[in-house]
Swiss-Prot record:
Sorted UniProt keywords: Cell membrane, Disulfide bond, G-protein coupled receptor, Glycoprotein, Membrane, Receptor, Transducer, Transmembrane, Transmembrane helix
Tissues and organs where the protein is expressed, per its UniProt entry: Expressed in many cells, mainly in the head region, with expression detected in the head muscles, I2 neurons, MC neurons, RIH neuron, AIA neurons, AUA neurons, ASK neurons, ASI neurons, a few B-type motorneurons in the posterior ventral nerve cord, pharyngeal muscles, body wall muscles, the intestine and a few classes of unidentified cells anterior to the nerve ring. Expression in the MC neurons is important to mediate suppression of feeding while expression in the RIH neuron is important for the facilitation of egg-laying. No expression detected in other tissues including hypodermis.
Chief place of localization: membrane
Glycosylated sites: N207
Protein name per its UniProtKB record: Neuropeptide receptor 22
Disulfide-linked positions: C126-C204
Organism: Caenorhabditis elegans
UniProt record similarity statement: Belongs to the G-protein coupled receptor 1 family.
Extracellular side: 1-55, 108-128, 191-226, 299-310
Protein function: Receptor for the LURY-1-1 and LURY-1-2 peptides which control food-related processes including feeding, lifespan, egg-laying and roaming behavior. Receptor for flp-7 which stimulates serotonin-induced fat loss. Serotonin induces secretion of flp-7 from neurons and binding to npr-22 which leads to induction of the atgp-1 lipase and subsequent fat loss. Acts in vitro as a receptor for the flp-7 FMRFamide-like neuropeptides TPMQRSSMVRF-amide, SPMQRSSMVRF-amide, SPMERSAMVRF-amide and SPMDRSKMVRF-amide.
Length: 434
């Protein structure tokens, strides 16, 4: 694999390197040599396609950054949302934010802006970007794996709180995913090098000559490891865990108990987990679908079709696969917004602060109809992680008296919500109004 370590720029590096060898830029033969004309046709986008790609990637980058920043703000700011599962979702948002910042802009800049596809960001950025890109994708994939284990344990050990993933354990798992991702991406920090091509233009790509004659074999082994550990193993784990979860959920019943309150608590937890599982399954399925075309195009097809660089419109094919993979970082916040009322309310709250000129219908509903929100709080009772054993009895994100008036003495965030605070109510008991 070339620059990018399995995150999408490797095939582009191969394409541009081959193109630079054939096209003979700035030479009179460019319009005379049929082979060069064909390569121009394959490797150069039309001006209209360039503008379309620039517009698409610019919108994608802004949406990815904005959405994942909102996810981070909502979880970090509201203390009651700092549950074990949400800590893992926070880590996933950080990984998607890294992809948004380091993968999307730098992967297409040199091809869309400059026809000679030069590298403009210097030697240090050449090595650092390849490392950060690969690390971010590993982090995203294995965070999904940890989330699947969290949901699996919540279902399998519903009546055994000590076995569940607590917030402290979630932090340990987050640290483990970072260490693993850094170690897996570390080789790219030393093998990706800045160089000048035969035309004297700055370029960036992998150089495995450090390993001597076995460099090519080492590269193939590393590429295979990246494909297996970045995609195959995570997807296999996700399929196994969620299949087991599905079988367990739909075929199990909550055991009878003499204590009615305890039984109700277990039933509520079971139902809440059943609501959450489809959301994380959807996130995992979209990860598989979004990344599969690009990984096949990078790691599988070149092994069976070495002449892939001579395929007509290969660059268009690559942009489609790359754009689809990058769009996964945007869809996760959208899923949270659609599937979970708490995230939706938090998004509306922070969006009203960041973009005060925009009016949100649901935010108006929450702020203008406080009493209605309390009467219909089941409508807004989406729970992110109701099964964390270390979670304290839940309250609303802002505290209200029973009359529905804001109790500013007990509200840590009263200054944020001002006179018309955002209401996020957790439905734990009939008497839990505060």
């Amino acid at each position: 694999m070339d620059e990018g370590g399995g995150i999408g720029s490797s095939l582009l590096s191969r394409i541009t390197t081959t193109a630079s060898e054939i096209m003979m830029r700035n030479e009179p033969t460019t319009t005379e040599n049929p082979a060069v004309q064909e390569m121009n046709h394959i490797y150069h986008l039309t001006p209209s396609m360039k503008m379309l790609c620039i517009l698409f990637y610019s919108i994608l980058c802004v949406c990815c950054v904005y959405g994942n920043v909102l996810v981070i703000l909502v979880i970090v700011y509201f203390k009651r949302l700092r549950t074990a599962t949400n800590i893992l979702i926070l880590n996933l948002a950080v990984a998607d934010l890294l992809i948004s910042v380091f993968c999307i802009p730098f992967s297409y800049w040199q091809v869309l802006i400059y026809d000679d596809q030069r590298w403009l960001f210097g030697s240090m950025m050449c090595s650092l970007l390849a490392f950060l890109q690969a690390m971010a994708v590993f982090l995203s994939a294995w965070t999904l794996v940890v989330i699947s284990f969290d949901r699996w344990m919540a279902i399998m050990f519903l009546l055994t709180p000590n076995i569940r993933i607590t917030r402290r354990r979630a932090l340990y798992l987050v640290a483990a995913t970072w260490i693993f991702s850094i170690l897996m991406a570390l080789p790219l920090l030393f093998t990706t090098r800045f160089f000048e091509d035969q035309d004297g233009l700055p370029n960036c790509g992998e150089n495995w000559t450090y390993f001597g004659d076995s460099g090519e074999q080492v590269r193939k082994v590393y590429s295979s490891m990246v494909l297996i550990l970045q995609y195959v193993v995570p997807q296999a784990v996700l399929i196994i865990t969620y299949t087991h979860i599905g079988i367990k959920m739909w075929n199990s019943r909550v055991p009878g108990m003499q204590n009615g309150a305890t039984k109700k608590m277990i039933v509520d937890r079971h139902e809440s987990v059943k609501k959450l599982v489809p959301m994380v399954i959807l996130i995992s399925a979209l990860f598989a679908l979004c990344w599969l075309p690009l990984l096949i195009l990078i790691n599988v097809i070149p092994e069976f079709y070495p002449d892939i660089n001579s395929w007509g419109y290969i660059l268009y094919l690559w942009w489609f696969a790359h754009g689809l993979a990058m769009s996964h970082s945007m869809v996760n916040p959208i899923i949270y917004f659609i599937r979970n009322a708490r995230f939706r309310e938090g998004f509306c709250f922070f969006s009203s602060k960041l973009l005060p000129c925009i009016s949100f219908k649901e935010l108006r509903l929450l702020t203008d109809n406080t009493s209605r929100s309390f009467r219909n709080r089941s409508r807004f009772s989406g729970v992110i992680n109701p099964t964390s054993s270390d979670e304290k009895p839940a309250t609303s994100l802002t505290r209200y008296s029973r009359s529905g008036v804001l109790d500013r003495q007990t509200c840590r965030s009263a200054r944020f919500f001002e006179a018309r605070p955002l209401v996020v109510v957790r439905n734990n008991s009939a008497n839990s109004l505060a």
